[in-house]
Swiss-Prot record:
Taxonomy of the source species: Bacteria, Bacillati, Bacillota, Bacilli, Bacillales
Record's protein name: S-adenosylmethionine:tRNA ribosyltransferase-isomerase
GO cellular component terms, semicolon-separated: cytoplasm
SUPFAM superfamilies: QueA-like (SSF111337)
Pfam families linked to this entry: Queuosine_synth
GO molecular function: S-adenosylmethionine:tRNA ribosyltransferase-isomerase activity
UniProtKB keywords: Cytoplasm, Queuosine biosynthesis, S-adenosyl-L-methionine, Transferase
Subunit structure: Monomer.
Gene: queA
Length: 347
């Protein structure tokens, strides 16, 4: 398939730059993947479509405030550091700007010197391995000095770091938020549980590769980035029981969907497991793990649009997106949501 098959017109004014004051104030476009019919709803209306016995699967990853601004100890030149992946001990794979003049042995100071980093290895594409030194607990120092690594299409500053975290964020490690989860409040989660809906949690640490554009014409040639995922024994048991009882498994976000599909591609049922996934889902893929999906509106020609097209059908999805544009839905990380399901299975 050609990458242009997943292109669509998107006015720049529809790219949400800031989150809404109330998490649940977002709109919800409901798409019947069987018929292609759409309905315009508010996010709390999700309660009308999720039945007792169904299970929502949420990604409990926590975004690191992974963008740091420091100065070279020797020259005072300013440096921007983006943490990508923790290696052994206090060593991290990072992206550094400007990278050209940051050589092995260079020391960077952050804040008032409570955090320093030494370059220990040069990598490709501006990457550097930095070894950090600090007093106390690294993540507490990072919380004080770091900024949220917002996606490149968001130009506004974020006033409240917590608005780029889900209310159930728990396990640190993401470079970006699992944005479908941003719409949920504790109150809405409680209402779902009171209705008899199960809540299950997985972890997938979102990498910056999620924003990497597809650079090939034929999408089958695209290579996905790898991301760490984990499923507990308790979650696996719950999901298998939901399946046995005839309930639907609804992934909250493409990260949850990719985790569930990765596990079901490798096993006959859900199991306790962890590892790295580079699963690439596009039309023609046969879903084994999920029955529905709650997700935000994604970038043209992105792997996420391809994933959602695989579930909803490409024409259904592009028609729904055209409707969303016409109705001025808000797009991308701080935007509105859609719920994709098959009405035939909705009792």
């Amino acid at each position: 398939m050609n990458v242009r098959d997943f292109d669509f017109h998107l006015p720049e004014k529809l790219i949400a730059q800031t989150p809404l004051k109330d998490r649940t104030a977002s709109r919800l476009l409901v798409l019947d993947k069987h018929t292609g019919a759409v309905e315009d709803k508010k996010f709390p209306d999700l309660l009308q479509f999720i039945e007792a016995g169904d299970c929502l699967v949420l990604n409990d990853t926590r975004v690191l405030p992974a963008r740091l601004f420091g100065v070279k100890e020797e020259t005072g030149a300013q440096v921007e550091v983006l943490l990508l992946k923790q290696m052994e001990g206090d060593r991290w794979e990072t992206l550094v700007k400007p990278a050209k003049r940051l050589k092995v042995g260079t020391i960077i100071r952050f804040g008032n010197g409570e955090l320093t980093a030494t370059c220990v290895q040069e990598l490709e594409h501006g990457g550097r391995v930095l070894e950090f030194s600090y007093e106390g607990i690294f993540h507490e120092v990072l919380d004080q000095l770091g900024e949220m690594p917002l996606p490149p299409y968001i130009k506004e500053q974020l006033d409240d770091k917590d608005r780029y975290q889900t209310v159930f964020a728990k396990n640190r490690g993401s470079a970006a938020a699992p944005t479908a989860g941003l719409h949920f409040t504790e109150e809405l989660l409680d209402q779902l549980k009171q209705k008899g809906v199960h809540l299950a949690f997985i972890t997938l640490h979102v990498g910056l590769g999620t924003f990497r554009p597809v650079s090939v014409e034929e999408i089958e040639e695209h290579e996905m980035h790898a991301e760490f995922y984990q499923m507990s024994a308790g979650t696996a048991r719950l999901l298998n029981e939901v399946k046995r009882q005839g309930g639907r498994i609804i992934a909250v976000g493409t990260t949850s969907a990719r985790t569930l599909e990765t596990i079901r591609q490798e096993h006959d049922e859900f199991v306790e497991t962890s590892g790295w996934t580079s699963i690439f889902i596009y039309p023609g893929y046969e879903f084994k793990g999920i029955d529905g999906l709650i997700t935000n509106f994604h970038l043209p020609k992105s792997t996420l649009v391809m994933l959602v097209s695989a579930l909803a059908g490409r024409e259904n999805l592009l028609n729904a997106y055209a409707h969303a544009v016409k109705q001025s839905y808000r797009f991308f990380s701080f935007g509105d949501a859609m719920f994709i399901y098959d009405k035939k299975t909705n009792s």
